Amino acid sequence: MLFFLKFESGFAAYNQTGGDGGKACGAYQFDYRYALLPFVKYAYETNPLVCKEFEPYAKYKSGAKLYNNTDFFKAWHQVYKRNSRTFSEMQDTFARINYYDNVERKLQSAGIDVASRSEAVKGAIFSYSIQHGQTSAVNAVKAIKPKSTTSDAKFLKKLYNYRKKSFPLYASRYTQEYKAALAELNQ
């Protein structure tokens, strides 16, 4: 399901800081304007021992102070170094809860069952939601009008074609990500 992460954060993945010009951190590129501060609070509350360097940042009222904050980036690396597995799992859980689970529920309410789809399809939807938001992901899946009889391969093709049409600036990424999704599907 997480085949798309290399397109989000590259090889640094969970330890990545300062992505998108100092705006984002982690495997999912949590952006200071949206999810970075909520993630920091979640991580610190979930495991204050592993994430002890996050204590001062978890008190922030606004994520704006995290923008291009090299002291915060050092804290991020320290947390990762202390327990990379736990910190990575926190990122996965936070992202899934905030960017995938709600999309799946909204699609189910609209009569589109993606819970029974392959991990490749779920990953493609997850990727869409991470990059463009939950509402955009839900609307994209609705727009391609998948039926229960639509194969996962066809679902992926339609979704990535829709994504390229909607966001042509990223067409090259989506072409590569589509290939990765098919590889995941065919495993």
Describe each region flagged by the PLM.
Residues M1-A115, A120-Q187:
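Cell-wall polysaccharide-cleaving catalytic domain and substrate-binding groove, primarily
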